[in-house]
């Protein structure tokens, strides 16, 4: 199932420059080369396998997994795969309190529903051009920020995060709520608070694509 050559081909083994490393990633680093840390792909594969087994257990119980990736090179990849497996995702800015204060999110969802009803019952058509413009802007803003989590009625059973350093607010909320995290961790990340850390290049779109494909495949084949 896992082919080391595939990981090498997409550059999953390339970490950051040695000056940017996090010492807690030491056990996942194979060597230094040209001033860059090289990740031990055998450990990457081992961690992906562990994460996939965990995912299968979650999906078999009918629970939801939230995907999080707001960095440019990961957004489209993650949203496409999340849609494929019918799971919620966040690829725009993480709004503080998305998990720890879901009541705020529900208020935003209510606003979206009100706008939808106004368009159905004809109220929207009776508005002035300026009012319509303001309503449309609000709807687009809410849709962009909330996206697919508008249908998430309860906390996810797990959160998959691309770049745990960038998504530190999401990580903190998951920790506070004891929600397990599966995270792609590069050599500049701290893996200690990640339940299922996957050591790999989190800057390469090809590396991200390969890893997310394995994780989502474990949902499809469950």
UniProtKB/Swiss-Prot annotation:
InterPro entries: Ribosomal_uS2 (IPR001865), Ribosomal_uS2_bac/mit/plastid (IPR005706), Ribosomal_uS2_flav_dom_sf (IPR023591). GO terms for cellular component: cytosolic small ribosomal subunit. Pfam families: Ribosomal_S2. One of its GO terms (molecular function) is structural constituent of ribosome. Keywords: Ribonucleoprotein, Ribosomal protein. The keyword Cell division does not apply. GO terms for biological process: translation. NCBIfam families: rpsB_bact. Belongs to the universal ribosomal protein uS2 family. PANTHER family: 30S RIBOSOMAL PROTEIN S2 PROKARYOTIC AND ORGANELLAR (PTHR12534), SMALL RIBOSOMAL SUBUNIT PROTEIN US2M (PTHR12534:SF0). This is Small ribosomal subunit protein uS2.
């Amino acid at each position: 199932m896992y082919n080391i050559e595939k990981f090498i081909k997409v550059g999953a083994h390339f970490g950051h420059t040695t000056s940017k490393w996090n010492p807690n990633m030491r056990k996942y680093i194979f060597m230094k080369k040209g001033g860059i840390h090289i990740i031990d792909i055998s450990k990457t594969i081992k961690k992906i396998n562990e994460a996939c087994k965990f995912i299968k257990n979650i999906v078999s119980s009918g629970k939801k997994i939230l995907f999080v990736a707001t960095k440019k090179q990961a957004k489209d990849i993650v949203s496409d795969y999340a849609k494929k497996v019918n799971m919620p995702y966040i690829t725009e800015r993480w709004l503080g309190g998305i998990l720890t204060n879901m009541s705020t999110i529900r208020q935003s969802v209510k606003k979206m529903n009100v706008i939808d009803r106004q368009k159905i019952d004809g109220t929207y058509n009776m508005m002035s051009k300026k009012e319509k413009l303001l309503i449309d802007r609000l709807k687009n803003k809410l849709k962009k920020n909330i996206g697919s989590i508008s249908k998430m009625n309860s906390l996810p059973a797990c959160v998959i995060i691309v770049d745990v350093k960038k998504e530190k607010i999401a990580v903190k909320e998951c920790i506070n709520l004891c929600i397990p995290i599966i995270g792609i961790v590069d050599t500049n990340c701290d893996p200690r608070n990640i339940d299922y850390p996957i050591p790999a290049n989190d800057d390469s779109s090809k590396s991200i694509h390969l890893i997310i494909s394995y994780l989502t495949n474990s949902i499809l084949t469950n």
